[in-house]
Amino acid sequence: HFTSTCRSCESGDLMRFPVKRGMTESGRSMVEMLGVLAIIGVLSVGGIAGYSKAMTKFKINKSMDQISMLVANIRTLFSGQRNYSGLNNTNAIAFGIIPGEMDGGGSVITNAFSGNVTISTATVNSNADAAFTIKYEGLGQEACVTMATSDWGSGSSSGLVSMSVSNTAADGTTYSGSDLPITLINAASKCSCSTAVCSLKWTYL
């Protein structure tokens, strides 16, 4: 659409040339569209970050529930036994004390973070198989710190002997007695993995 615009109004001479209105409107629309896309991009990134954080918290809570359940199930199953002899991943699955969602088939047990879970026995005060251990691998720093500093019980009544914290899959620093629950400073220092390779191990009577 074209209109005429006055070029010069002196001496009564009118010189007119066509102006296309749609050009400025189109440019403004493009800028507005880019602005909207930028806002959508920011919101999308924020939404993904928020979802990821929420999922991490969900998995942490799930893992803590699973560990509590495993401890209770193992202690109940072996309550009439002299010790925990024979307890391992394969038998734990066969005895039905592993939640179905953790059963990876065969002797494989996985946690909510898709890391390996290892159930074994431990020697306490020179008594073989007097305790059992549950090891969680594949933990990120946040999960490691949160779970390490949680109150898993202390004293003989709780049955918790010790906890081991590591920034790798290998066993790390062990805390027991008055060092439990593990302090935030110690947990942050030991859960120093930059990727999800931290691990925790609980030893219970």
Predicted regions and their residues:
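N-terminal single-pass transmembrane signal-anchor helix
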Residues: 16-59, 63-66
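Membrane-proximal N-terminal amphipathic helix
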Residues: 49-89, 95
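Periplasmic/extracellular, small/polar-rich flexible segments of pilin-like filament-forming proteins
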Residues: 79-205
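Cysteine-centered motifs
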Residues: 6-9
